[in-house]
């Protein structure tokens, strides 16, 4: 084969959400910090080309993300990574941290210790501690100690053409979220409503980013509302979520960074305290354990340290390559399967 670029990937899913972990063949990513590497991926033509190569057709699919492993910068970290999606590279993700941890352990890149292995992941948002329960050579469950999460603004109200005034919380859990009580748009969080939820999420994300500017007070590379997460409460008290992702799909997992952002709003409203735990349930019924382990501050703002626990499962191992004569090397997407915003890719 005459490929001019070859990368190895290990396919993992976390509670239904796919994270394809790049384990070999990636070029060196410039930057002295992971935040600088994230910025390069999102601003340099070479970074954009690598992201498109891995995430778009014919090599990529709408479902899931690509987790690009990087050499760690921090002396305590075992590995660093950024999350590649069709829109851009992202700073942090709970489900992708679980996928990366599972891949590192089950591939042997990090030595597995039974019954428990602790891995420190370095992200652009900070260090994430992953405590993996291990047995018989497999990673059974991963508990993440997430980055400090904080509220940007509660009860933001915006005008919408379809639902009138919609109220949302803008909160940070590793990236910024608009958190919306789903009943405001006349829907429930279930698989049959996935397409309608996605369309609503794309509309609301566009509207809120037009009206507000959000920037992390300490990490300026992290800015803008990345996702809209719809939320509801099930009969058993579990929080049901649906995170909508550009260009138009629903997260299959309960969403780790989204639940971290939501936990910050619950703490701000006095609804949870240190030591509390609860279940979060996704649109497909998969679950995370969510906990409030500690409180802290970020640039003078009250913040929480969330824990998120879930399972990762490996299901594939493959290579992707680029033929130098392939006219579609830059990748493409179409609205038939990629969602309503695919025409803007």
UniProtKB/Swiss-Prot annotation:
SUPFAM superfamilies: Diaminopimelate epimerase-like
Keyword set includes Isomerase: yes
Keywords per UniProt: Isomerase
Induction remarks: Is up-regulated when the bacterium is grown on t4LHyp or t3LHyp as sole carbon source.
Lineage top rank: taxon: Bacteria
InterPro entries, per the entry: Pro_racemase_fam
Binding site for substrate: 85, 94-95, 251, 256-257
GO molecular function terms noted in the UniProt entry: 4-hydroxyproline epimerase activity; trans-L-3-hydroxyproline dehydratase activity
Keyword Isomerase: yes
Catalytic residue list: 93, 255
Catalytic activity: trans-4-hydroxy-L-proline = cis-4-hydroxy-D-proline
Family per record: Belongs to the proline racemase family.
Function statement: Catalyzes the epimerization of trans-4-hydroxy-L-proline (t4LHyp) to cis-4-hydroxy-D-proline (c4DHyp). May be involved in a degradation pathway of t4LHyp, which would allow A.tumefaciens to grow on t4LHyp as a sole carbon source. Can also catalyze the epimerization of trans-3-hydroxy-L-proline (t3LHyp) to cis-3-hydroxy-D-proline (c3DHyp) in vitro. Displays no proline racemase activity.
Record protein name field: 4-hydroxyproline 2-epimerase
Organism encoding this protein: Agrobacterium fabrum (strain C58 / ATCC 33970) (Agrobacterium tumefaciens (strain C58))
């Amino acid at each position: 084969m005459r490929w001019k670029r070859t990368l190895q990937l290990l396919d993992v899913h976390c509670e239904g959400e796919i994270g394809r972990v790049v384990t070999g063949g990636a070029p060196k990513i410039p930057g002295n910090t992971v935040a600088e590497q994230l910025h390069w991926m999102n601003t340099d033509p070479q970074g954009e080309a690598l992201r498109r190569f891995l995430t778009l057709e014919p090599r990529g699919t709408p479902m899931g993300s690509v987790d690009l492993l990087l050499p760690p910068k921090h002396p305590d970290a075992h590995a660093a990574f950024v999350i590649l999606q069709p829109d851009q590279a992202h700073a942090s993700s709970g489900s992708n941290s679980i996928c990366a941890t599972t891949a590192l352990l089950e591939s042997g890149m990090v030595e597995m210790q039974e019954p428990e292995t602790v891995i420190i992941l370095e992200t652009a948002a900070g260090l994430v501690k992953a405590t993996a329960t291990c047995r018989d050579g497999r990673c059974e469950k991963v508990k993440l100690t997430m980055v400090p999460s904080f509220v940007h603004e509660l009860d933001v109200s915006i005008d919408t053409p379809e639902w009138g005034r919609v109220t949302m919380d803008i909160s940070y859990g590793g990236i910024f979220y608009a958190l919306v009580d789903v009943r405001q748009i006349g829907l429930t969080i279930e698989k049959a409503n996935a397409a309608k939820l996605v369309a609503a999420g794309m509309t609301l994300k566009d509207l809120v980013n037009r009206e507000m500017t959000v920037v992390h007070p300490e990490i300026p590379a992290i800015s803008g509302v990345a996702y809209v997460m719809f939320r509801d409460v099930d009969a058993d008290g579990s929080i049901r979520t649906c995170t909508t992702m550009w260009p138009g799909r629903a997260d299959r997992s309960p969403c780790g960074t989204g639940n971290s952002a939501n936990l910050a709003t619950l703490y701000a409203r006095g609804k949870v305290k240190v030591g509390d735990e609860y279940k979060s349930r996704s649109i497909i019924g998969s679950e995370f354990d969510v906990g409030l382990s500690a409180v802290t501050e970020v640039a003078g703002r009250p913040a929480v340290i969330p824990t998120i626990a879930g399972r990762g499962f490996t299901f594939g191992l493959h290579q992707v390559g680029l033929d130098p004569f392939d006219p579609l090397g830059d990748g493409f997407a179409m609205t038939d399967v990629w969602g309503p915003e695919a025409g803007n890719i």
